[in-house]
């Protein structure tokens, strides 16, 4: 997607807000996973609403835990373990998130994909400059295979 907005204009503001508030949009458009996992409204939009607790069904939206079961290759991990984490960081840069998996390599792969979004995704970087370090190689910035830290407004000791 060619960037055709200026920071602060109506298009920029709308895209930022949609990404912050709609996981389906964050995953499919901003993180660019739509074509990668073949996102569809019928399956993936519903999954995103369940994850975000925005189904409109009080019993689902107020439940403290959610279990999402989908077939292998359907994009569940890409959307939930990557795009949802990116969205939560954008919503609250002071958050601390633990990414775990049965295999360490999978958790590291999820973090690598998240880092790629922050480092290489020009659309994401243009929409959310406040969570991008100007110099991720700086000595005081944690940015490696096991932990990252985005700019924060608090002195929280845990990494992002």
What are these regions (language model features)?
Residues 35, 72-73, 98-102:
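Conserved aromatic-histidine-acidic binding/catalytic patches
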Residues 45-52, 78-90:
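Contiguous, well-ordered alpha-helical segments that form the cores/surfaces of helical PPI scaffolds
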Residues 84-101, 105, 112:
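Glycine-rich phosphate-binding loop of nucleotide-binding enzymes
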Residues 62-63, 93-94, 155-156:
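Short, well-ordered loop/turn elements at secondary-structure boundaries
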Residues 60-83:
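Walker A/P-loop
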Residues 100-160:
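Conserved nucleotide-state-sensing and coupling region of NTP-binding domains
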């Amino acid at each position: 997607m060619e960037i055709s907005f200026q920071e602060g204009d109506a298009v920029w503001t709308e895209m930022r807000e949609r990404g912050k508030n709609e996981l389906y949009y964050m995953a499919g458009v901003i993180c660019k996973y739509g074509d990668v996992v073949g996102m569809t409204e019928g399956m993936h939009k519903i999954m995103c609403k369940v994850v975000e607790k925005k189904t409109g069904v009080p019993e689902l939206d107020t439940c403290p835990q959610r279990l999402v079961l989908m077939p292998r290759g359907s994009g569940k991990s890409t959307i939930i373990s990557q795009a949802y984490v990116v969205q939560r960081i954008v919503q609250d840069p002071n958050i601390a998130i633990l990414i775990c998996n049965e295999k360490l390599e999978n958790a590291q792969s999820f973090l690598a994909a998240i880092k790629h979004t922050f480092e290489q995704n020009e659309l994401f970087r243009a929409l959310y400059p406040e969570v991008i370090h100007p110099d991720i190689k700086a000595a005081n910035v944690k940015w490696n295979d096991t932990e990252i830290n985005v700019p924060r407004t608090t002195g929280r000791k845990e990494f992002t």
